[in-house]
Amino acid sequence: KEGIEMIPAILGEQDILKYLATTPGIITTNALDPGIYVRGSNSCENGFLTHDMEIASPDHLTGILSTFDPFILNNSTVYKSGFPAVYNSYLSSYINMRPDPGNKQKYEGEITLGLVSSALKIKGPLVRDHTSFAASFRTSYLQTIARLYNKSVKDQKQQNFMPEYAFNDATVSIDSKLSNRWRVTAFGLFTIDGLSMKLNENVNYDFNWHTFSGNAGAWYTPANGDILHFRLGVKSAFSEGDAEGTIPMGGGNRNYSIIARIMYTHSFLDKFQWNI
C-alpha cells in the first residue's frame, strides 16, 4: 500500500494496476487504460485472483479504472513466469491479491474525492479481538457532467452528444478468528456500470454491465501444526444492451462460475490440493 501512495493518482483515484506498471517487465499503454502488458504479451492474458479465486473482471466497462481498491486489496503476489501448477489457462501472468483483514481493535476510514468519482472506506471490529471487516463503496459522477452538457446542446439534431457513463463498485472483506484452531474469511466485489448514448434525435442506446466475485474460506489447524484449508468461490458477469429507434434492438449475456478448493499442508514443502 505504501508503494501505491507514492505514485500519481490518475483522475484522483489510486489504482493497483497503475502501480504494477511501475515494476520491471510490466507496462501500460496510456494513463486511461487500466490494462497491463507483461513482457510484451496481451492484456487479456493476465489472471487476477483473490485468495487464489479468479475475479470476474479486473476493470470497469470503459476501462478508465480497475475495480480493485487498494484500501482493501493492499497485498499481492505477482507471477510473471514459473507459475505454480495450480494456475492454468492464462499465458502472461497471475496476480494473486489478499484482502486486508481489517482492524480488530478500532475503527478507521477515509473519504476520497476524485475528478470522476468519490469513495467511502471503513474498517474496524465487528466483534472486538475476534472478527473484523473492511469495506469500500465508490460511485462516479461522470453521468451528471455528461447530462448537463447534453442539455446545453442547442441543436438536438446534431450528433455531438456526450455518452452518459456511470460506474459503481463495492468491496467487502471479513476476517474472523473463531478459536485458536479455526479461522474464517469472506470476500466480495460487486460492480455496476451503465452507459447511455444518444446517437441522434431518434436513436438511443443503453448498455448495462454487472459483475460479482466472491469467496469464503475456512482454515483448521490441528494440534500437530498441519493446516486444512477449505474455500468456495463464485463469480458472475451480466451484460445487457438495448437500442430504441426506428428498429428496436437488444441482447444480453450471463456467465456464472463456481469452484471449490481443499488444501492440506503438512509442511512448507508438502502441500496437497483438490479443485472442484
Language model feature labels by segment:
Residues K1-F83, Y94, D100, S117:
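Periplasmic N-terminal accessory/gating domains of Gram-negative outer-membrane beta-barrel systems
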Residues G63-S66, N74-A85, S93-G124, S132-T139, ...:
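Short strand-turn segments of transmembrane beta-barrel domains in outer membranes
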Residues K80, P99-P101, L115-S117, L126-R128, ...:
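Transmembrane beta-strands of outer-membrane beta-barrel pores
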Residues Y107-I111, T131-A135, V184-A186, L228-L232, ...:
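Transmembrane beta-strands of outer-membrane beta-barrel proteins
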Residues V116-T139, Q156-G194, D206-L228:
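Transmembrane beta-barrel wall of Gram-negative outer-membrane proteins
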